Amino acid sequence: MANHRNLAVLDAADSVADEINRLIDSRPRRVIHVYQLRKASQSIGANISEGFGRGPGPERDQKLRVSRGEAEETIRHLRANYASNRISRTDYWRLRNRLIAIVRMLSSLLREDYIIDPDLDDENTQSAAGD
């Protein structure tokens, strides 16, 4: 699996968090759920980094699941702001679609851990060859 410093999902998460910060800071009409929106968007990348810093295994998977939940929470806060006309349709859909892509990327990373285990495949191949 890739080093966390070279992960497209981490780059995407950082980019979304930066854009949300700019959006919040530039709105003439006050955005609602500011604290939660900032915190959730920043937590996506932070949890990805922490998970990959821990190495493969259940702790990494848990951090990736937390990141996925934070992305979903960010979408909910953006939706509330869009519904109350505090952010534009363009901003909402652009950020929402990018967050959906992040959720899918995280789900894919979680599936990789269970589908491909090179150590297990090597053991099974060697065992079958010896029979």
What spans do the regions from the language model cover?
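Amphipathic alpha-helical assembly/interaction segments
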Residues: 1-131
